[in-house]
Amino acid sequence: LTLGARGRRTRSPSPTLGESLAPRKGSFSGRLSPAYSLGSLTGASPRQSPHAQRKLSSGDLRVPIPRERKNSITEISDNEDDLLEYHRRQRQERLREQEMERLERQRLETILNLCAEYSRADGGPETGELPSIGEATAALALAGRRPSRGLAGAIVVSGRSGEESGGASQRLWESMERSDEENLKEECSSTESTQQEHEDAPSTKLQGEVLAVEEERAQVLGRVEQLKVRVKELEQQLQEAAREAEMERALLQGEREAERALLQKEQRAMDQLQEKLVALETGIQKERDKEADALETETKLFEDLEFQQLERESRVEEERELAGQGLLRSKAELLRSVSKRKERLAVLDSQAGQIRAQAVQESERLAREKNAVLQLLQKEKEKLTVLERRYHSLTGGRPFPKTTSTLKEVYRSKMNGDMASPLPRTRSGPLPSSSGSSSSSSQLSVATLGRSPSPKSALLAQNGTSSLPRNLAATLQDIETKRQLALQQKVELPPAEPLSPEDPAGHQVIEEQRRRLAELKQKAAAEAQCQWDALHGAAAFPAGPSGFPTLMHHSILHHLPAGRERGEEGEHAYDTLSLESSDSMETSISTGGNSACSPDNMSSASGLDMGKIEEMEKMLKEAHAEKSRLMESREREMELRRQALEEERRRREQVERRLQSESARRQQLVEKEVKLREKQFSQARPLTRYLPNRKEDFDLKTHIESSGHGVDTCLHVVLSSKVCRGYLIKMGGKIKSWKKRWFVFDRLKRTLSYYVDKHETKLKGVIYFQAIEEVYYDHLRSAAKSPNPALTFCVKTHDRLYYMVAPSAEAMRIWMDVIVTGAEGYTQFMN
């Protein structure tokens, strides 16, 4: 029994143990049913539990197939709640199994105790020699219960141990039958002996005892038969239990093989996953190395681009300074040019003033000449009137004959009308009679024709009965009015802006005006001479009354200077003939044509001079307008330049202010650092433990290793006996930016050089040993914007302080001890 219970406990619990407990519990109290046999396994599924297979009726034994594992731990390994539930369920099943095993153990002990009591009650010595299986069988028969699974397991185990001798269980049952027969024989013999001993007793008593013995014997025989039947049933149950155990063993063996196959499969999958993991790690490492190389390449490219950008910025700064200096020089030159031009403009203004004064004097002279001519004209007109009256009185009212002098008068009137061309020509009506003209001609004076405010109206008012031609008077008044307007404009005109002395346009305009003025004067003189010659030439050819107009047209009028007069001659050839009466034409001037400087010629010359003066003034106005336009454009250009210079000045002021603030801030930082250094002067060289070594046979690597540094374990430094190489991050001198540089400490060249990269092709700087004064740790954190202040150290030279950042603390210590061996500028120890 102990072996059976132990074998049951050592067997691994099946996942379907909770499902098979119910039929097991039922089998402990009830008898074995006929259906509960091996023949009921016909349609059993190989994936069902062995207890379910025992309930089925089938005679054939199939190859065991692994059962389906439900609620396996491999299915719920990802869910923590399911794992906790699985653990709790398994614990409850184990507790329930332990409780059932305890109950079975108590029941078996009870059965054994009953068997022992029964054996003692029988008193047969042979019964004590029966094996425990017989006692258990008898106890089971008395208890009337089905043997438990533990007992069946014990019987199966004992049966398996006796299979080597063959038929052990059959011998057990035979010995049990023999013991039963012996018991019966003993009972019979004991009964017979008791009968023989009590034969002498009374018959009634004997009969009663015989009956009692017979009844008891009948009961014993009945019990014996029952026990035999029970023994046979138990034998069948034992055989069935053996078959069930064998089948369960086969099922467990199949399940074990299936689990082993799954285990091998999972083992192979795990090996494959391990190989994949190794390959993945290798690929990741390769990718990481590739990315590191790419990053290093990009970093180098970025450093190169940044250096180029800094160079461009410095170059742009220099170009801006040069441009600023050029602008300042240009500004100075422009200021000098402006001063020169102002001087030239002052000179031109003075010249223009002189020209205006000369023009005013010339106009005044011409006005005086005109007044004198008008006075002479008035005198001649008065003479003419007197002559007409005398001729009229002498001839009895007959007019003067029309002679060449009358034609000259007509020509002079025509010329005066042409000189007054800005005013429209009007046809005059016939003048009043000579009687009326003689009465009003004496009233005409120089003041009336000269400078009256409204000379035309006054002349017409006073000339109502005069014989003076009205068109001629209007022409003279128009000339005087234009002269007065020109003088008023000159007086009212504000002083023009002076032309630039170096402006070629203004100078050219003035020269052109002067040249045109001279040409106009020459043309006026030539025309006056030509007209005078033409008039005197026409007087030498007398003509009849009928042929005079044609002679007038071809001999005199074709000498007019412009085609406009010729074109208008067809329409207005005799416009001025109506200014006088027919008798006045015949009795016109008799002595006027004999003078070389007639009043009409003088008035014509004065009209030409006034036109030229007006033209000159117009050209002066145009020159002033051109000068104003040029000055405005020049002023705009100067304003743009001034704005650009002002913007540049403001920008420079801002830069200077920022520079001053930065200088002040740096000065404060320097003062603070000096104060801290004065307080901590003892820590000026915290890690420089060695003095510079100038020996030729000095081994740098041995020296560093003897100092306690792990050179071989530090991958950031490449150290040999004479040279030390590695990357350091250095702060720039002018531009405070941090750059990664490849440093080379060479004891043969006695220099500390740094390059762009480890190829050592582009040298960025050299520090000679004689210039290195100190090497110390930056304990004051004075490096601006250091990438790693904890790994920053300083290399002090004669003219500069280098800030460097090492990639690791060990590399920083190695570099400091390496560089200090070449600090030959540190001469304080010699004192």
Swiss-Prot record:
On this chain, the residues bearing Phosphothreonine are T16
This protein's GO cellular component annotations are:
basal cortex
| SUPFAM superfamilies (UniProt xref) | PH domain-like
Q: Where is the PH domain?
A: 721-824
Q: Where is this region: Disordered?
A: 1-73, 160-209, 416-465, 584-603
Chain positions with Omega-N-methylarginine modification? R6
A Pfam cross-reference name: PH
What are the entry keywords?
A: Coiled coil, Methylation, Phosphoprotein
Q: Where is the composition biased (Polar residues)?
A: 39-51
Q: Say yes or no: keyword Nucleus present.
A: no
* Sequence positions bearing Phosphoserine: S12, S14, S27, S33, S45, S49, S57, S72, S77, S175, S421, S467
Would you tell me the protein name for this molecule?
Pleckstrin homology-like domain family B member 1
Q: Which organism is it from?
A: Rattus norvegicus (Rat)
Gene behind this protein: Phldb1
